[in-house]
Amino acid sequence: MIHFKLDLKSGVPFHRQIVDQIRFGIASGRLLPGEQLPTVRDLAVQLEINPNTVRKAYSDLELLGILDTQQGTGTFVSHQQVEIGDAEKRRMLKQ
């Protein structure tokens, strides 16, 4: 599991920060295939943001095949491998 944190001063939209943190968590092995993510509501409360922001991040990642959402069960890391280029890794590490 990873700890989510938003940078209020970065200028990067919150949903994009969530997407980046999940992708980096998977690539770095901190999030494993099949691992359940916090519910939309729980993550929104934790980050003090609108649930629609979390929902958009999860939806974007689901469209990419990175997350699987199972109605009534939760959102899980897909078993599909995620490739992140070196430039993107450096950008994520700077955040």
Which residues fall in each region the model found?
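Short, Lys/Arg-rich nucleic-acid/phosphate-binding segment
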Residues: 37, 66-77
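Extreme N-terminal segment that seeds HTH/winged-HTH DNA-binding domains in transcriptional regulators
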Residues: 1-36
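Short, hydrophobic-biased segments on the C-terminal half of alpha helices
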Residues: 22, 58-59
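Short hinge/loop at the helix->beta-strand junction immediately C-terminal to the helix-turn-helix recognition helix
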Residues: 30-31, 60, 65-66
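Conserved segment of winged-helix/HTH DNA-binding domains
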Residues: 81-95
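A short alpha-helical element within helix-turn-helix/winged-helix DNA-binding domains
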Residues: 36-47, 61
